[in-house]
Amino acid sequence: MAKRTKKVGIVGKYGTRYGASLRKMVKKIEISQHAKYTCSFCGKTKMKRRAVGIWHCGSCMKTVAGGAWTYNTTSAVTVKSAIKRLKEMKDQ
């Protein structure tokens, strides 16, 4: 079998349509949404995207809400770290 894509990867399905810069942006998004992420409950790399913002772990069968294209958004990480810091300050 011949190798199909060398540079374009997952966005090869769009062919020459829509322009190179738009396809590069879409490539970054599609790679992140199809990737498997580490589950925050069981620690295994089984977290997959089911729908927009819905993530499901195939190991522990937990379903959680997350980002549209990635499991954790930057704002969610910031909020979690702030909550953790406030809990530590309260305990002291």
From Swiss-Prot:
Main location (coarse class): cytoplasm
Classification via InterPro entries: Ribosomal_eL37/eL43, Ribosomal_eL43, Ribosomal_zn-bd
Gene3D superfamilies xref list: 2.20.25.30
Zinc finger (C4-type) stretch: 39-60
Binding site for Zn(2+): 39, 42, 57, 60
Molecular function terms, GO-annotated: large ribosomal subunit rRNA binding; structural constituent of ribosome; zinc ion binding
Keywords tagged on the record: Cytoplasm, Metal-binding, Ribonucleoprotein, Ribosomal protein, Zinc, Zinc-finger
GO cellular component: cytosolic large ribosomal subunit
GO term, biological process aspect, one: translation
Compartmental location: Cytoplasm
Superkingdom classification of source: Eukaryota
Function: Component of the large ribosomal subunit. The ribosome is a large ribonucleoprotein complex responsible for the synthesis of proteins in the cell.
Family membership: Belongs to the eukaryotic ribosomal protein eL43 family.
Quaternary organization: Component of the large ribosomal subunit.
HAMAP family: Ribosomal_eL43
Stated name of the protein: Large ribosomal subunit protein eL43
Organism of origin: Ictalurus punctatus
